[in-house]
Amino acid sequence: MNPPKITDIDEKIGSSCAELIRDGDCLQLGIGAMPDAILGFLTHKKDLGIHTEMFSDGVVDLVEAGVVTCARKNFHPGKMVATFFMGTEKLYKFVHNNPMVQMFPVNITNNPAIIAQNDNMVSINSTLQVALTLSLIHI
């Protein structure tokens, strides 16, 4: 599967959001161009962790750069925790028999009590719409 197309706007937002992520943070990643854009700006960070339902090629690049180590995670330290993967052949080759990758069902990866075991969790997601009037949008 081809990665989502990252636009100039995605890159500007991604650059700003990446400034909010600190060394040692544990990341939950959503689907789409925005999480991938943010990941591209994290190459100067240290000891990031991954505890997420899904991850993509951007995580592989950060592991290979030594940015993602999962060393500061409390739940399965040294391991990336995920339910599924979405990306290119490079991603699937990376996760195949990789001892750093641990697969769990969604009732583990998305369980608030388990997520809370990791310090400094940061969720990176996109949104489709926001109502500025604070009313609900029914789609």
Q: What is the meaning of each model-derived region?
A:
Residues 1-104, 114, 129-133:
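Metallocofactor- and cofactor-centric catalytic cores in central/energy metabolism, strongly enriched
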Residues 107:
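Active-site-adjacent helical/loop segments in soluble small-molecule enzymes
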Residues 119-121:
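Short loop/turn motifs at secondary-structure junctions and domain boundaries
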Residues 125:
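Catalytic, metal-anchored helix/loop core of enzyme active sites in primary metabolism
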Residues 137-139:
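Conserved small/polar residues in nucleotide/adenosyl-binding loops
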